[in-house]
């Protein structure tokens, strides 16, 4: 509505003054004026395609329904299993992550029984084929309970399958980010580090540079091994996606403790996010909007009421005053979306000054 546009316009004006942004708002009624431009939503689905087409974007600039069907299949969590096999059979050092399988409702492992679950002495986790940001997970830490059984039954009924994997002894999360041009070339964009809760749900990103990530990872694995993992992943992704997908994609990874062999190893294929993702956002923020050497967090918070959000927003503005120099955040709290009297969520960064 008009009120929302006013808040967005005011917020954009403020950001333009702080960061010299060469951007402007486009409302839905204005879409016909941009009918021949490339549309880059966070991710694609039939509803977004229909909305863009109805709004006036030319059909030639939108993915076809058939392309969306193929995109959906390529975005399934089960695709990570092929990458697990690749790393396993090539015996890439300092990697882990085996013991995972796809459970399908076509006669192959359709009945998940306690005997199967008992293979995983430390517990296991079931993952929906389509979800993200730590959602669509069912943790099985204390045996095959009725709740777990019901979850598996629903997943088989709704999606015809799910992924089953052991619970790894995770130390930290990170990701490698890439861009596919859709014409055969897949480029490495950078790294991101993120934080999850004990149930695997996304809680935020650590704002840090690629150089800082490469320094951080060396406390766990040698840098040469890390580069080999990155190169192997880039080559595998290029083979799988570079001609059939255009856009950003991220591969979630984790550092894990090991009981045998090296003390630590990298699980390099936890999840493949075939879309724009929080890691890309945090990488862009670190590269272009945070002072070099600055560190902080990029987070998304939800609140039960807009009053609770407004109270916390005002408190953070006072506790962490924003300092911007030469178009980059030196320190402080910066909301990344307008916080209005009706808001119940916020996306923001909080940066600490570089020493």
What does each model-identified segment do?
Residues 123-149, 175, 198-217:
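Glycine-rich phosphate-binding loop of ATP-grasp-fold ATP-dependent ligases
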Residues 102-103, 117-139, 157-170, 251, ...:
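ATP-grasp fold ATP-binding core
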Residues 148-203, 254-269, 277:
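Phosphate-binding site of ATP-dependent enzymes
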Residues 178-235, 273-300:
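ATP-dependent carboxylate/phosphate-activation module, predominantly the ATP-grasp catalytic core
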Residues 6-114, 131-132:
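Conserved N-proximal alpha/beta basic substrate-recognition cap immediately N-terminal to
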Residues 291-355:
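Peripheral (often C-terminal) accessory segments that flank ATP-dependent C-N-forming ligase machineries
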Residues 130-132, 167-172, 242-247, 340-343:
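A short catalytic or substrate-binding loop motif that flags glycine-/basic-rich loops and adjacent residues
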């Amino acid at each position: 509505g008009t009120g929302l546009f006013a808040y967005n316009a005011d917020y954009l004006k403020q950001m333009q003054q702080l960061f010299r942004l060469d951007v402007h708002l486009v409302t839905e009624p204005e879409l016909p004026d941009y009918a021949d431009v490339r549309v880059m939503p966070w991710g694609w689905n039939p509803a977004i395609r229909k909305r863009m087409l109805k709004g006036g974007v030319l059909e030639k600039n939108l993915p076809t329904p058939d392309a969306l069907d193929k995109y959906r299949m390529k975005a399934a969590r089960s695709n990570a299993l092929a990458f697990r096999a690749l790393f396993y059979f090539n015996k890439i050092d300092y990697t882990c992550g085996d013991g995972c399988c796809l459970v399908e409702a076509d006669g192959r492992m359709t009945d998940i029984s306690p005997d199967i679950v008992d293979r995983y002495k430390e517990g296991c986790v079931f993952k929906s084929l389509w979800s993200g940001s730590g959602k669509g997970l069912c943790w099985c830490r204390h045996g095959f309970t009725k709740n777990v059984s019901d979850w598996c039954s629903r997943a088989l009924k709704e999606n015809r399958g799910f992924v089953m994997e052991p619970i790894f002894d995770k130390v930290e999360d990170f990701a490698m980010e890439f861009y596919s041009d859709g014409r055969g070339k897949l480029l490495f964009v950078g790294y991101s580090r993120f934080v999850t809760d004990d149930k695997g749900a996304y809680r935020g990103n650590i704002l840090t540079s690629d150089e800082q990530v490469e320094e951080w990872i060396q406390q766990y694995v040698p840098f040469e091994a890390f580069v080999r993992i990155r190169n192997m992943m880039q080559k595998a992704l290029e083979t799988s996606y570079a001609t059939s997908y255009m856009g950003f994609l991220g591969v979630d990874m984790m550092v894990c403790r090991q009981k045998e062999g090296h003390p630590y190893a990298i699980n390099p294929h936890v999840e493949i996010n075939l879309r724009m993702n929080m890691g890309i956002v945090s990488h862009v923020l670190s590269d272009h909007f945070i002072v070099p050497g600055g560190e902080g967090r990029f987070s998304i918070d939800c609140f039960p009421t807009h009053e609770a959000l407004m109270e916390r927003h005002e408190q953070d503005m006072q506790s962490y005053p924003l300092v911007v120099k030469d178009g980059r955040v030196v320190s402080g709290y910066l909301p990344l979306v307008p916080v209005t009297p009706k808001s119940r969520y916020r996306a923001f960064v909080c940066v600490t000054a570089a020493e």
